[in-house]
């Protein structure tokens, strides 16, 4: 097999970078050179996976409070469009004497798609969320309205700056190969997706920064509570969880994020362990239930571990996942505005006592394990390159 220079281009967000790291590792193990355009924050993780981190600078802020504000104001579409234009010249500079044989870009990293078009090299799309095709598109009416408004404003900006036309519609167009980090059975309208889409399930690998489990698992059932890395600035929620499960039969591990000091949550019960972050993959291996925001990584990690969910979505895409979890009978959807001490207790009781639900979770776990993960994704990439007849 020929060895290639593969460029990965992503946005600076854990939910988009983390699924790619095991894939980077597999490609490097197979002898390919992987350069990864990212920000300083993610460079160590890329390097630990065996890739070369090429640093670009961005105005996108991944601070949880800023993200929450951006989503509430619906500023995300315009921010992502403008960001793609600021990153493109940086990519040109980073790769000016080192052109890749292949570009792999995340499904919202528009700069990656534009850069591939400019270089006229083969391109593959990674979907860390739901894949899109001619039948299924991400976006509710409110979001599409905001995108149209953003694109109108953006078009005027492009004309003023004499820049080429760029549109969100470009991101919805499938590539010849699209790698999707979920099993096909979890994809919405999965029956409409053809063989351009390779559903490999979560690309997990071993997290290099893995730490030891915070507590020893005893005979009590173990509950993990986490709202992920981006939407966790919600102290009232954590206080409700403490009230709901104080001195209960549950052993609880709760991750509250970087913006909240665990010590600020007063009178922590003996059955709670609260940290700003926890080794989620390791905890899920021993967990019996997961209260989650419904981010795709967390959802897939739960299914990989065979753990049922109570999903409290914080944004539109997570609402889709909460609905999908509910529709497939893998857990309970608890809307954010309906979260109370009693609704948390009721949701947990409903999930933990439903043996048929637990059986469906085990079936989805089987789908996840059989999807192939990073190993299959790497093999599909090599087959694609062979078919593309890219010279060495």
Curated annotation (Swiss-Prot):
Activity vs pH: Optimum pH is approximately 8.0.
KW Glycosyltransferase (keyword) present: yes
Organism of origin: Bacillus subtilis (strain 168)
PANTHER family cross-referenced by the UniProt entry: STEROL 3-BETA-GLUCOSYLTRANSFERASE, STEROL 3-BETA-GLUCOSYLTRANSFERASE UGT80A2
Chain sites annotated for binding UDP: 18, 229, 255, 278, 293, 297-301
Pfam family, one: EryCIII-like_C
Catalytic activity: an NDP-glycose + an acceptor = a glycosylated acceptor + NDP
Subunit note: Monomer.
Keyword list, A-Z: Glycosyltransferase, Transferase
Temperature profile: Optimum temperature is 30-40 degrees Celsius.
BP GO annotations: antibiotic biosynthetic process
Name of the protein in its database record: NDP-glycosyltransferase YjiC
Effect of residue 106 to A: Significant decrease in activity for both pterostilbene glycosylation and UDP glycosylation
Activity control: Activity is improved in the presence of Mn(2+), Mg(2+) and Ca(2+), and inhibited by Ni(2+), Zn(2+) and Cu(2+).
A molecular function (GO) term: UDP-glycosyltransferase activity
Effect of residue 315 to A: Significant reduction in catalytic efficiency and glycosylation levels
Enzyme class, UniProt record, top EC level: transferase
Effect of residue 107 to A: Shows slightly reduced activity
Function: Glycosyltransferase that can glycosylate a wide range of substrates, including various flavonoids, phenyl ketones, curcuminoid, lignins, zingerone, triterpenes, stilbene and anthraquinone, using UDP-glucose or ADP-glucose as sugar donor. It also exhibits O-, N- and S-glycosylation activities towards simple aromatics. In vivo, the broad acceptor tolerance of YjiC might function as a detoxification agent against exogenous xenobiotics to make the strain adaptable to the changeable environment.
